[in-house]
């Protein structure tokens, strides 16, 4: 059972309570703190669209602490981040691995950050399928196309040559925050909020 903290605010009309995620949303903060799957993707996409409708000119802040997950769910978030008008600033806290790292890198250029003790991991897409040989072949071809697409996007977002990306994602590739900055996955390592 997951417990969600409640925040109580004083207003001129009295007290109002929010779950913590709703309160963060009021400040244009979205928190992705679990595996990327269809449910979490739907929630993140809905929040992105809501915040765009609220104010299309104000940045949105996506905090990421995720081990990764579904490629199709992650691509729904990625495409929405690129589609909406506001810049989406991404901030890694803890770990951004696999699709989590991909979404971290998908933030607006100049607005992709990690806290100093964060870890970022990139690798090639994982897939598993069983069944008839013909169906296995179909799925193998699909995952190779997805791998090419993800590599191409990572190359574009990091500035790394495609051949470097292909080599570097062959196995789990863990980076500390400063290494991720040098690689181009993020733009800066931050230690405190700007005052």
Curated annotation (Swiss-Prot):
Keyword check for Protease: yes
Organism domain of life: Bacteria
Cited Gene3D superfamilies: 2-enoyl-CoA Hydratase, Chain A, domain 1
Gene Ontology cellular-component annotations: cytoplasm; endopeptidase Clp complex
EC numbers, comma separated: 3.4.21.92
Keywords, ordered alphabetically: Cytoplasm, Hydrolase, Protease, Serine protease
Main location: cytoplasm
Localization, UniProt: Cytoplasm
Active site per UniProt: 98 (nucleophile), 123
EC top class, as a word: hydrolase
MF GO annotations: ATP-dependent peptidase activity; ATPase binding; serine-type endopeptidase activity
GO biological process: protein quality control for misfolded or incompletely synthesized proteins
Substrates-to-products reaction catalysed: Hydrolysis of proteins to small peptides in the presence of ATP and magnesium. alpha-casein is the usual test substrate. In the absence of ATP, only oligopeptides shorter than five residues are hydrolyzed (such as succinyl-Leu-Tyr-|-NHMec, and Leu-Tyr-Leu-|-Tyr-Trp, in which cleavage of the -Tyr-|-Leu- and -Tyr-|-Trp bonds also occurs)
UniProt-listed CDD domains: S14_ClpP_2 (cd07017)
PANTHER family: ATP-DEPENDENT CLP PROTEASE PROTEOLYTIC SUBUNIT
Complex formation: Fourteen ClpP subunits assemble into 2 heptameric rings which stack back to back to give a disk-like structure with a central cavity, resembling the structure of eukaryotic proteasomes.
HAMAP family: ClpP
Family (UniProt): Belongs to the peptidase S14 family.
Protein function: Cleaves peptides in various proteins in a process that requires ATP hydrolysis. Has a chymotrypsin-like activity. Plays a major role in the degradation of misfolded proteins.
Name of this protein: ATP-dependent Clp protease proteolytic subunit
Annotated source species: Clostridium novyi (strain NT)
């Amino acid at each position: 059972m997951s417990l969600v903290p409640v925040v109580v605010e004083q207003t001129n009309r009295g007290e109002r309570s929010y779950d913590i995620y709703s309160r963060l949303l009021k400040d244009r903060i979205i928190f992705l703190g679990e595996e990327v799957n269809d449910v979490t993707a739907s929630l993140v996409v809905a929040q992105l669209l809501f915040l765009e409708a609220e104010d299309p000119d104000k940045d949105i802040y996506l905090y990421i602490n995720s081990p990764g997950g579904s490629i199709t769910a992650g691509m729904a978030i990625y495409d929405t981040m690129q589609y909406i008008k506001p810049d989406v600033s991404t901030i890694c806290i803890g770990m951004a691995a696999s699709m989590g790292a991909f979404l971290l890198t998908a933030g607006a250029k100049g607005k992709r950050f990690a806290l100093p003790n964060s870890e970022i991991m990139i690798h090639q897409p994982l897939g598993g399928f069983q069944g008839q040989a013909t169906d296995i072949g179909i799925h193998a071809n699909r995952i190779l196309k997805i791998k090419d697409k993800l590599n191409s996007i990572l190359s574009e977002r990091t500035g790394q040559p495609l051949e470097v990306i292909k080599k570097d994602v062959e196995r789990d590739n863990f980076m500390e925050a400063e290494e991720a900055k040098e690689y181009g996955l993020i733009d800066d390592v931050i230690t405190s909020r700007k005052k």
